[in-house]
Amino acid sequence: MSRVCQLTGKKANNAYAISHSHRRTKKLQQVNLQWKRVWWPEGKRWVRLRLSTKAIKTLERKGLSAFAKEAGLDLNKL
């Protein structure tokens, strides 16, 4: 499974690890992804999503249906 948030589409970022002597080596900054079971009131069931922690906070504010519609995600297929 790829490390991508299912609602926001966030994925890894390419960055530099910079040492004290300022030598640069490339590193990958991964997204903090968590498996989350969310109650979907319209479908009357639980939906299991792989979300970034930022998406979990936004989900609490917006609600699942509005956030999924904005992301273009069909919850019936999950």
From Swiss-Prot:
GO MF entry, a single one: structural constituent of ribosome
InterPro entries named among the record's database cross-references: Ribosomal_bL28 (IPR026569), Ribosomal_bL28/bL31-like_sf (IPR034704), Ribosomal_bL28_bact-type (IPR001383), Ribosomal_bL28_sf (IPR037147)
Cleavable signal peptide: none
Domain of life of the native organism: Bacteria
Keyword flag Ribonucleoprotein: yes
A GO cellular-component term linked to this record: ribonucleoprotein complex
Annotated keywords: Ribonucleoprotein, Ribosomal protein
Gene Ontology biological process terms, A to Z: translation
NCBIfam families: L28 (TIGR00009)
Family: Belongs to the bacterial ribosomal protein bL28 family.
UniProt name for this protein: Large ribosomal subunit protein bL28
Organism listed in the record: Thermosynechococcus vestitus (strain NIES-2133 / IAM M-273 / BP-1)
Gene of this entry: rpmB
